[in-house]
Swiss-Prot record:
Belongs to the thymidylate kinase family. It catalyses: dTMP + ATP = dTDP + ADP. This is Thymidylate kinase. ATP binds at G11, P12, D13, G14, A15, G16, K17, T18. The lineage of its organism: Bacteria, Bacillati, Bacillota, Bacilli, Lactobacillales. PROSITE patterns: THYMIDYLATE_KINASE (PS01331).
């Protein structure tokens, strides 16, 4: 069975990862013989998108932290079996906007839940699947929140309402994950001009995944 390439895009809110993903897509399609599939978490398929709406609804500020975690994991499982795995089996290049690292950073470090438990639950839901490459877009938490506030086209969600300290804990979690997984996670300084970040992201993908 042909195996595709699985790349995740990670980063705190306001890092610009989604913008970079969209920007490099046309160039990647020219470089790859198979299809290039883009998707997101939570979401990507109908059931997971419905769960996304529940999680991010600004009216659900009383959501319990463990409830939030389990909803993310449920969405991830459905997305995996319905979208990610079928595309990888076809040998396609799959780019996903957030994956397991988001849960560990946000629910583990950000919410203060047991990071090992968060990791175990996610591994259970994904049968241990890990991306071949993870691009982590790093930016100071205050800069990220300022970008969100200035982006009038972006819809505000429940996580945007969190205090700065929460976002700093999330960033700290991401940095620790990057330190612990140097073979998989490549850190990109996302505080630089967007064009530089886009250039770096495309170069890393070509070097690590497309030129072997």
């Amino acid at each position: 069975m042909t195996k595709g390439i699985f790349i995740s895009f990670e980063g705190p809110d306001g890092a610009g990862k989604t913008t970079v993903l969209e920007a490099i897509l046309p160039q990647l399609k020219k470089l790859v013989a198979k299809e290039v599939i883009t998707t997101r978490e939570p979401g990507g398929v109908a059931i997971a998108e419905s769960i996304r709406d529940l999680i991010l609804d600004v009216n659900h500020t009383n959501m319990d932290d463990k409830t939030e975690l389990l909803l993310y994991i449920a969405a991830r499982r459905q997305h995996l079996v319905e979208r990610i795995l079928p595309e990888l089996k076809k040998g396609n290049l799959v780019l996903v906007d957030r994956f397991i690292d988001s849960s560990v950073a946000y629910q583990g470090y950000g919410r203060g839940l047991d990071a090992d438990a968060v990791t175990w639950l996610n591994n259970f839901a994904t049968d241990g699947l890990q991306p071949d490459l993870t691009l982590y877009f790093d930016v100071d938490s205050q800069i990220g929140l300022t970008r969100i506030e200035k982006n009038k086209e972006r819809e505000v969600n429940r996580l945007d309402l969190e205090q700065l300290d929460m976002h700093r804990r999330v960033r700290s979690g991401y940095l620790k994950l990057a330190q612990e997984n140097p073979d998989r996670i490549v850190t990109i300084d996302a505080a630089r001009p967007l064009e530089e970040v886009i250039t770096d992201a495309l170069f890393i993908i070509k070097q690590r995944c497309l030129e072997k």
